[in-house]
Amino acid sequence: MNIVSSIALAVAFILLGVNRIINIKKNTEALYEAVRFISSVKNNIRYLSMDYVSLVENAENENYSYITFHPEITISDCVGEKVKGEFLQFVQKIGTTDEDGQLNFCDEYIERFKGFYNESASKEKSKVNVIGAISVLCVMCALVLGG
């Protein structure tokens, strides 16, 4: 293997590692944003007695990065199917009960998403370290084989 191909391979390993680390961080950020969204919905129901249409209009103005509102309210695919399904269940149930029921429902989903977030945040550091170490090891192997 010549030096040019080994450098190209090393750069590819670096880019793969960086891409994976960015995806892990996006997952954690999206989960945090979901908790923020659900908390905002709860506060708007509790203090402003907003209906579904008002909740959506207000949420659209809050500048979420991982939550979209058109054609329907969804969360980014970076969170995985299980979390995305839970988020869609929450969105579908907003406005289906009285105010107390909605507040209890919001509390339940806030706790669920805090659990998802805490799990993701606790694993994030170790995953990032492992992926970084593997990327460095692959880069070193590529350079040794090419040199």
What are these regions (language model features)?
Residues 96-138:
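Membrane-interface, cytosolic juxtamembrane amphipathic helix immediately N-terminal to a transmembrane helix
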Residues 25-26, 42, 82-84, 93, ...:
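Context-gated lysine
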Residues 71-100:
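Short, non-transmembrane cytosolic segments of multipass membrane proteins
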Residues 1-70:
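Juxtamembrane/interface alpha-helical elements of multi-pass membrane proteins
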Residues 7-16, 121-147:
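Bilayer-spanning, highly hydrophobic alpha-helical transmembrane segments
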